UniProtKB/Swiss-Prot annotation:
Name of the protein: Chaperonin GroEL
Gene from which the chain derives: groEL
GO cellular component: cytoplasm
Organism: Klebsiella pneumoniae subsp. pneumoniae (strain ATCC 700721 / MGH 78578)
Family membership: Belongs to the chaperonin (HSP60) family.
Record bears the keyword Nucleotide-binding: yes
């Protein structure tokens, strides 16, 4: 086992604090409407330019191992805030730095670290309740656009796009961010249920100009099995032909003789058919087939529950107003399923989302909810260069997370004002002893840090602005973009409550642990080992020259 380097007490804390400050100082230059960019060197390709706090934090590793431990702990704050709310990483870092700096001063002055931590925790618990009380619901398009704009660093087009996307696909709808092809940002909305499986044979195409299959008011056959024998399907095909409607087959696979017969029937115009593979794999495929059945009012024909394809009737088939199938995707528009059944299915999947343990499962389940509930919107980010595209895409992603958080838990006044108001309301809070009271004061003083940093990045004097804001009440604050005071809600400067809450909770959690640190242990740096291999091994090569 390698030898360890151990530091105690103040020596350890000073090193740790230096690491905290290096990382936090790099991150906090990005805060606010006048925050600057940070350029990150990459081992290959062009450098990345970003204003995203967590991207900056992730890049930082320090040479001194004790300092690096401090930096890594603050990095954890940014990552946790990002995971919980998808935004507010810079605010969380600034709060953590403020709590650690103030807290360690108190420890150096002889306060008990454990009581300080208890005081900080008490203040944060009370602050979270106050934040919830200040929060107002965020339901209208205008508020959503404002939240998106602020999170995308005052880029109004991004805020408007996100609000428009949420209008189209609902608050629960899936909104994804992709690289665009032009200079402008675009919004594409896919209404109805779309899944990524295309037609099984190009001979099904009936719209050669678009290379797609479009079927009006088709029946939809859902089978959880491979179909290779056409005889199984004859009763259904005959019934559909009599009804004079087209048929879409969604099955595990359609192959061989069955596929050939369907193609021939379609080309001769006997019955219009199109076949696609069912989306997903394994259990997820079964679940998605059931989703489609609920949406279209059909039944999944599965041998597991004793149903056979030969005995299927028109009652077992789903229906939709229109189905569009191209090379890679199938879209079902206006399924005839009962609204109550669809809502029941959505509620069932939401329950699974609550119980899901992995992010991947949760994401897939949310996609299923969106497909049943409304549709999918794609924001295509436009930019002139690859570097700008990456930076802008990261901002749009942040803004999207922020708006989701706002819809979930509401909004509070932005620009660091909400935390200042909360701190003022908690001025009378006391702990069980004097050291806890100091801990409470440390937390309350730290709550001013985001406002001070926003002002500092705008080139103004933080103390003057902070005092002016504290003299006001309610949503009165400072708009750093226009350098004027007023009602933050009227200015459209809003922060999602969830983002502010998560930032404060994670910052206090990690900062509290750092304040109570008394000893740090790390590996000793390895000394340079004597390099015997190269010099020793090559000695015999000297004689080779004469042999040539």
């Amino acid at each position: 086992m390698a030898a360890k380097d151990v530091k105690f007490g103040n020596d350890a804390r000073v090193k740790m604090l230096r690491g905290v400050n290096v990382l936090a100082d790099a991150v906090k230059v990005t805060l606010g409407p006048k925050g600057r960019n940070v350029v990150l060197d990459k081992s290959f390709g062009a450098p990345t330019i970003t204003k995203d706090g967590v991207s900056v934090a992730r890049e930082i590793e320090l040479e001194d191992k004790f300092e690096n431990m401090g930096a890594q702990m603050v990095k954890e704050v940014a990552s946790k805030a990002n995971d919980a709310a998808g935004d507010g990483t810079t605010t969380a870092t600034v709060l953590a730095q403020a709590i650690v700096n103030e807290g360690l001063k108190a420890v150096a002055a002889g306060m008990n670290p454990m009581d300080l931590k208890r005081g900080i925790d008490k203040a944060v618990l009370a602050a979270v309740e106050e934040l919830k009380a200040l929060s107002v619901p965020c339901s209208d398009s205008k508020a959503i656009a404002q939240v998106g704009t602020i999170s995308a660093n005052s880029d109004e087009t991004v805020g408007k796009l996100i609000a428009e996307a949420m209008d189209k696909v609902g608050k629960e709808g899936v909104i994804t961010v992709e690289d665009g092809t032009g200079l402008e940002d675009e919004l594409d909305v896919v209404e109805g249920m779309q899944f990524d499986r295309g037609y099984l044979s190009p001979y099904f195409i009936n719209k050669p100009d678009t290379g797609a299959v479009e079927l009006e008011s088709p029946f939809i056959l859902l089978a959880d099995k491979k179909i290779s024998n056409i005889r199984e399907m004859l009763p259904v095909l005959e019934a559909v032909a009599k009804a004079g409607k087209p048929l879409v087959i969604i099955a595990e696979d359609v192959e061989g003789e069955a596929l050939a017969t369907l193609v021939v029937n379609t080309m001769r115009g006997i019955v219009k058919v199109a076949a696609v593979k069912a989306p997903g794999f394994g259990d997820r495929r079964k679940a998605m087939l059931q989703d489609i059945a609920t949406l279209t009012g059909g039944t999944v024909i599965s041998e597991e529950i004793g149903m056979e394809l030969e005995k299927a009737t028109l009652e077992d088939l789903g229906q939709a107003k229109r189905v569009v199938i191209n090379k890679d995707t199938t879209t079902i528009i206006d399924g005839v399923g009962e609204e109550s059944a669809i809502q029941g299915r959505v509620a069932q999947i939401r329950k699974q989302i609550e119980e899901a343990t992995s992010d991947y499962d949760r994401e897939k389940l949310q996609e299923r909810v969106a497909k049943l509930a409304g549709g999918v919107a794609v924001i295509k980010v436009g930019a002139a260069t690859e570097v700008e595209m990456k930076e802008k895409k990261a901002r749009v992603d942040d803004a999207l997370h922020a708006t989701r958080a706002a819809v979930e838990e509401g909004v509070v006044a932005g620009g660091g004002v909400a935390l200042v108001r909360v701190a003022a309301k908690l001025a009378g809070l006391t702990g069980q002893n004097e050291d806890q009271n100091v801990g409470i004061k440390v937390a309350l003083r730290a709550m001013e840090a985001p406002l001070r940093q926003i002002v500092s990045n705008a080139g103004e004097e933080p103390s003057v602005v902070a005092n002016n804001v504290k003299a006001g009440d309610g949503n009165y604050g400072y708009n750093a973009a226009t350098e004027e005071y007023g009602n933050m809600i009227d200015f459209g400067i809003l922060d999602p409550t969830k983002v502010t809450r998560s930032a404060l909770q994670y910052a206090a959690s990690v900062a509290g642990l750092m304040i109570t640190t008394e000893c740090m242990v790390t590996d000793l740096p390895k000394g340079d080992a004597p390099d015997l291999g190269a010099a020793g091994g090559m000695g015999g090569m000297g004689g080779m020259g004469g042999m040539m």
